[in-house]
Amino acid sequence: MQEVTHMITKREFLNTNGCATLGWLTHHQKGERPPLTFAQENRFYIGTRIGQKARDQFPNGQLISGINNQSVIATTRMALQKTQNGVFFEAAFEANDFIAKADIVRKIGTVYHIIEVKSSTEKDLSKSEGREYVEDLAYTVWVARKAGFNVEKTSLWFLSKDYRLGDHASKLFSKIECTQAVDMLVPVYDSKPNSIQATLQNTNQPTPKPITDCKNCDFNHQCYPDFDAMTIYQIPGLRTAKHLEAGRRTAQDMVGEKLNDTQKRAVDCIIDQV
């Protein structure tokens, strides 16, 4: 196993917040991830291209770079301190061993506007479909504020559904200010550092607990070698959270539970195949 690094990333923080086991594995298995699939490489490529399109809207912006995280953090602080007004790409912040990078930072006097660029189309931030994007941005803002930067405004840039080939580049993004939604999450994150650090610094992996997200988790078979036998995840449209909490794991466990006709047929088919 690779040596565990001290600094905690956004991905590790958010993963641990949702599932202690996932966060621990993410932190302790750095460098052990399998090679990217073609689909994953393609998503990264598209994300990079979209990020560049966002930067193009700030032709005088400055890219922050360095040989490692610490150098990027130091360069960020120096650049922001010596500039009265400016735009910065890939600025990095660190506070109490938590690190975050921002796609775009605008500095106006003594205040900052953090922008995160997404490669998906616009999401409703008041619903579950948009929550992960707000959580992602809130982490960056939380770390930046802890590092001493006065972040007063935050925005998410999504791909505009109205953009058409040939339109001006300024129409490519749907720009949503989400300062209020982010500000509501920052105090929640303020209560998390001690427990998250304790989890990640523990040499023992936390005991996994089945949750809804296990279905698509990269580590589901590592946590549960018999995961394929947990057939409750194969039932369509099922709100699995309450059933998992009650100890139900298989289609057989769902016999007699309140299900719609489609779910009942799925349960019967799964049981017949066992």
Where are these regions (language model features)?
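Mg2+/Mn2+-dependent nuclease catalytic core
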Residues: 78-184
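Short coil/turn segments at secondary-structure boundaries
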Residues: 26-29, 67, 207-217
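Extended, structured, electrostatic nucleic-acid-contact surfaces
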Residues: 215-238
